Amino acid sequence: MHTVKLLCVVFSCLCAVAWASSDRQPCHSPPLISGTMKVVSTGGHDLASGEFSYDSKANKFRFVEDAAHANKTSHTDVLVHFEEGTLYEIDSKNESCKKETLQFRKHLMEIPPDATHESEIYMGSPSITEQGLRVRVWSGKLPELHAHYSLSITSCGCLPVSGSYYGDKKDLLFSFFGVETEVDDLQVFVPPAYCEGVAFEEAPDDHSFFDLFHD
């Protein structure tokens, strides 16, 4: 118990130092994170809700929508290899796969290096133990998509909290819950065997991560 308390004190001190001395450079996500992600439109429509996994070193992302979400007849299951520019839309029920090229590779799981630091705020209470969360807010433009974004991440740990995307075609709000610094099964980043040999489908140059979420 004393060890746990000591570790908590040390962690709090390190966070305080980071708060005081940070030069506000974009941080990097932990090597592996997972949790729940919810996406809604600014009009209040639920677009997707499910489990995500992200490998920051390999820049790979998996999102599996809750099958019961929004009474949909089908649900989203996507695997994105951002470095390779490949997007897989997976239908495990029918063992089918759609493969597309992804020319635009920015996303909201990482802070882009050209992002602007907007503010550092406390969500909840800064004075009551375990009743607040310190976050940093970053923003930037995505000129290729005629869009801009904002991203809130924890000041200590660089974990995603929320994000927004505002473009000509759509506006999206992202929320992240129960984020852990681990992924239970690394096979989630490997395309199923039935995706092998599938030909790439043509996609527009501005095809992006944000196109995955729509009414």
UniProtKB/Swiss-Prot annotation:
PANTHER family in alphabetical order:
EPENDYMIN-RELATED, MAMMALIAN EPENDYMIN-RELATED PROTEIN 1
Task: Enumerate the Pfam families for this protein.
Answer: Ependymin (PF00811)
InterPro entries in the record: Ependymin, Ependymin_CS
Briefly state the modifications made to the protein after translation.
Different glycosylation variants are known as EPD-beta and EPD-gamma.
Q: Name one GO molecular function term.
A: calcium ion binding
**Which Gene Ontology terms describe the biological processes this protein takes part in?**
cell-matrix adhesion
The listed locations are:
Secreted
- Signal peptide extent: 1-20
Q: Which GO terms describe its cellular component?
A: extracellular region; lysosome
Q: What is this protein called?
A: Ependymin-2
Q: Partners and quaternary state?
A: Forms disulfide-linked dimers.
Family stated for the protein in its record = Belongs to the ependymin family.
Q: Give the positions annotated as glycosylation sites.
A: N71, N94
- Gene (name only): epd2
